[in-house]
């Protein structure tokens, strides 16, 4: 799942999700049922017949997430998927992602330059240095998830401390390498 939604503009929401599961569901009816199930899981059931240009950015991103999850991956790679979204939509999408993560119990590799987003979403943060790319540090996030066992409290003192540590690691790795 990438920053740009990469949806086929000539396909409906349902058809975009169906596209990724053709091999798993050769029967078009079964493929359609599976696609509708995923569209429903991301909260877009009533928009299944809509086209991407009829959806908001957050809705388009949910379609992209449904399409990525429909084949049943064990690992979901997300490269700055919420970077282009406004703050409110980003917060909703983060919540949706956490709900999906809990429901499916899959590994999510989430790439972001937003430190707060990293601390909110991650159980473990890997800090990479540029040129050449290498692992600088691994930072386990031990801040409890309070709201429904999903969300972290941004105003908890530990949250600020982790942000400070993470910021320091980034400054150190950038200064040393570029």
Q: What do these predicted regions represent?
A:
Residues 2, 14-22, 32, 140:
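Short helical segment in ABC ATPase nucleotide-binding domains corresponding to the A-loop/adjacent helical element
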Residues 3-8, 114:
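Catalytic "switch" loops of ABC-type ATPases
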Residues 18, 29-47, 99:
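Conserved ABC ATPase "signature" region
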Residues 50-53, 71:
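Conserved signature/switch motifs of ABC ATPase nucleotide-binding domains
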Residues 65:
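Hydrophobic anchor residue at the start of the ABC signature
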Residues 76-79:
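Catalytic Walker B motif of ABC-type/P-loop ATPase nucleotide-binding domains
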Residues 90-104:
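Helical segment within the ABC ATPase nucleotide-binding domain
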Residues 105-111:
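Conserved H-loop
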